[in-house]
Amino acid sequence: MSDWPDELASIGAIRFARRSSNFAQTVRFYRDLVGLPLYETFEDSYGSNGAIFGLPGSALTFEIVEADGAVPVDHHEQLCLYFPDEQAKQTATARLQAAGVEQVESHPYWEAMGGVTYPDPDGREVVFAPFVFGANEPEGGSPPRSTSENH
């Protein structure tokens, strides 16, 4: 991976958010079945209810915000969780399997790389990969890298 551009080097954290039309079920899914640590919940904060997940020691957080109605789902919008090996991936997916959550068809890339895909309660896909992007990717696993300085 490349270094941060100078103008972004001072960023201290990154959060990405998505709306959920099945808020309570989605929070339970990510907390209880996926196992993401729930850092904080909020109610009526500037008109929104939400939950913030993260990983210990990481400056990256994932926020679920309750939607008033149906939220369109784009199946290319995936949350990808990278594990160091197949055993760690299997351990991470055991709760989903025990709860009866059925896998959905994975994108051909994930299937070829040993990943499995599960839907969250909104129908968004969560991919569990048996490798860490940029560290121990399987042979042929890296997407083409940009050689342009303006990528």
Describe each region flagged by the PLM.
Residues 65-68, 131-133:
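Acetyl-CoA-dependent GNAT
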Residues 43-46, 70-71, 107-111:
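A short beta-turn/loop motif at secondary-structure boundaries
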